[in-house]
A protein has these predicted regions:
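Short intrinsically disordered terminal tails
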Residues: 1-2, 139-149
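Acidic (Asp/Glu-rich) sequence patches and key acidic residues
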Residues: 33-48
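Generic secondary-structure transition motif, activating predominantly at the C-termini of alpha-helices
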Residues: 113, 117-120, 135, 142-145
Length: 149
């Protein structure tokens, strides 16, 4: 799987919210029979967050349970998972931790889609394009960079 594709696990739900494609995938990550749901959303081509390192330096851009744990840094698909310390990993409702349902993950992923859409404005796109061009110009003018003429 390349870093910018949708996951290859079992698709549980797909929808579009405010123009953002969203999906919930499930997989038995621990081979214990419990298929844990995780949420994913697609960043539009010109979205300013598409080129950020969402799992590193720019991890605070989106507020989602556990942070962005899939994609980022040029990826078209970003996602989050339900495998954190305060989550129920067993699938047993009698065990401690939050046991996420597909409906719960859909709600949290829809909240992520709202954040993506809120950042996808004409102003933010124009600023991103201007910043990209400034970086390109700086690279062209940098005397320490080798040119291939």
């Amino acid at each position: 799987m390349s870093h910018d594709d949708w996951p290859t696990s079992e698709l549980a739900r797909a929808w579009t919210h405010r123009g953002i494609d969203c999906r919930v995938y499930v997989a038995d990550y621990l081979d214990n029979g419990y298929k844990r749901p995780n949420g994913y959303a697609e960043l539009p081509e010109a979205h300013p967050a598409r080129h950020l390192n969402l799992q590193g330096d720019d991890c605070g851009v989106f507020d989602v349970h556990g942070g962005i744990t899939f994609g980022g840094d040029g990826s078209r698909v970003i996602g989050w998972d339900t495998a954190h310390y305060d989550d129920n990993w067993s699938g047993d409702p009698n065990k401690p931790g939050r046991l996420w349902t597909v409906d719960d993950v859909e709600d949290e992923t829809t909240r992520l889609a709202d954040q993506i859409a809120d950042l996808y404005t004409p102003e933010s796109i124009a600023m991103f394009k201007a910043a990209t061009r400034l970086r390109e110009l700086a690279d062209e003018l940098d005397p320490t960079k080798e040119t291939h003429a």
